[in-house]
């Protein structure tokens, strides 16, 4: 518990989210894999400077990359724990499984957390009311980013009405997220999708949870 409290305190210390600055790639992912075992921002920046100096990288650019990965990983991990706390959810035993985070009523799911996509062709209200359409769009859109798989997914969509660019801060609002996750898990609405890829038809299940801050 103390460890979880520490990482949450450190996540709250981040005042600004730096831009990626470059497309995510295998080399910089490998060089920044220390983010998985680094809890404090002070230790994070110490490792960033160390690796940047050793690999002759620009510290600010590499730092932005590593900070984003650190924040996204640890907020994802903490949000997963909100699911694990519910009696209908069973964690995947292999923490490195690429497409399954947990089982909901026996069905495997991959958790995806993102801001409401600016490229979505409809409004937030439309996506809220037509979650099947939004979920289908997210699958297709993510296929264009090289992250496509046809397994079941549970999407958490974040949106700050007053400042959409600050949606990243909602990833660490664990109290509000716990309420949204708990509400969904009490009576899960699962959407049956039909997807086509390389001449094959896939029918995954999807769920969509919104956290919208006014």
What are the functions of these language-model segments?
Residues 1-98, 113-214:
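Nucleic-acid endonuclease domains
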Residues 102, 107-115:
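Conserved catalytic cores of phosphodiester-cleaving nucleases, focusing on short active-site segments
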């Amino acid at each position: 518990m103390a460890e979880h409290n520490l990482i949450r305190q450190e996540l709250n210390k981040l005042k600004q989210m730096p831009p990626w600055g470059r497309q995510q790639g295998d080399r910089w992912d490998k060089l920044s894999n220390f983010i998985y075992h680094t809890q404090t921002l002070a230790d994070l920046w110490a490792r960033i400077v160390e690796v940047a100096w050793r690999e002759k990288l620009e510290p600010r650019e590499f730092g932005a990359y590593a900070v984003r990965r650190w924040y996204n990983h640890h907020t994802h991990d903490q949000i997963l724990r909100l699911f694990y706390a519910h009696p209908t959810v069973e964690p995947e035993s292999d923490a490195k499984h690429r497409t399954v985070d947990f089982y909901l009523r026996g069905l495997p799911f991959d958790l995806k957390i993102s801001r409401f996509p600016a490229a979505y062709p409809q409004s937030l209200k439309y996506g809220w009311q037509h979650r099947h359409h939004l979920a289908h769009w997210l699958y297709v859109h993510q296929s264009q980013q090289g992250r496509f798989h046809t397994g079941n997914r549970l999407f958490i969509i974040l949106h700050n009405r007053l400042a959409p660019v600050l949606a990243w801060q909602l990833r660490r609002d664990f109290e509000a997220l716990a309420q949204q996750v708990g509400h969904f898990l009490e009576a899960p609405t699962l959407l049956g999708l039909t997807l086509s890829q390389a001449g094959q038809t896939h029918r995954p299940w999807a769920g969509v949870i919104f956290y919208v801050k006014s």
